[in-house]
């Protein structure tokens, strides 16, 4: 059975589970995945170029959502929206130049408030801008990880939804003050489901296992910290039942970074 067939089966099973839960949130979230998963599969099937386009488009969406979330001025958002997708595109066309492009992206967003002479909010703009570049740079992993990225995407997605459902069902101690609604029980359930997905897809390696077990929950908490800092519930509201794209990719971003660092 191919990876695509397995993922299609999991998506179908998820739809049944979402329907049985009778929770509007899970049904809407499944609908979003039902639309998004075929797009992801098609892009990754197209090879490195398709992966770069997918990652670049995701980077643009995340940068726009993040700019609105942190209330960056429009000029900062524009520079960030150009800088972020350049990282995965460079990973495709000139991977050896990736460090230089990443440095240029950081310098570009840092210079905006400096050149604007912002004496009151400049430091905040600089910090938020540089955080955005660093946070979204792991999207280069969609290109660099090759076929492994599909298994990582599936495992993190399943771990994320299982953690949410398991935490609500089992309850118990809260995971972190950053996200009081999340529970340790959900973390354990999500980790088991994510690692099981890697095993089923034949992609269970130490690097990917750590990326799923540690990167997924920590990535979720990182976004929770940012949202709490700016007093927001979701990164956006355009994605039915799921807030924004960043709310769905937060776990994947840190997982991609860990997989890249550990050399999947």
Regions found by a protein language model. Give the residues of each.
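Interfacial loop-to-transmembrane junctions
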Residues: 228-252
């Amino acid at each position: 059975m191919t990876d695509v067939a397995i993922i299609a089966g999991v998506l179908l099973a998820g739809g049944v589970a979402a329907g049985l839960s009778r929770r509007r949130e899970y049904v809407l979230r499944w609908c979003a995945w039902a639309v998004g998963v075929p797009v992801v599969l098609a892009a990754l099937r197209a090879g490195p170029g398709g992966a770069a386009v997918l990652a670049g488009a995701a980077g643009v969406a995340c940068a726009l959502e993040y700019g609105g979330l942190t209330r960056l001025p429009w000029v900062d958002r524009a520079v960030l929206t150009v800088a972020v997708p350049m990282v995965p595109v460079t990973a495709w066309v000139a991977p050896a130049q990736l460090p230089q492009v990443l440095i240029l992206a950081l310098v570009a967003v840092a210079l905006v408030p400096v050149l604007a002479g912002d004496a009151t909010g400049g430091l905040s703009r600089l910090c938020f801008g540089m955080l955005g570049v660093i946070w979204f740079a792991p999207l280069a992993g969609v290109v660099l990880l090759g076929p492994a990225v599909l298994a990582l995407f599936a495992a993190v997605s399943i771990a994320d939804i299982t953690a949410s459902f398991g935490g609500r069902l089992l309850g118990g101690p809260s995971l972190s003050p950053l996200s009081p609604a999340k529970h340790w029980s959900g973390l354990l359930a999500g980790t088991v489901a994510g690692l099981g997905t890697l095993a089923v897809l034949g992609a269970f390696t130490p690097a990917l296992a750590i990326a799923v077990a540690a990167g997924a929950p920590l990535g979720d908490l990182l976004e929770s910290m940012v949202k709490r800092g700016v007093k927001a519930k979701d990164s956006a509201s355009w994605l039915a039942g799921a807030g924004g794209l960043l709310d769905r990719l937060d776990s994947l971003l840190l997982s991609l970074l860990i997989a890249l660092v550990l050399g999947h």
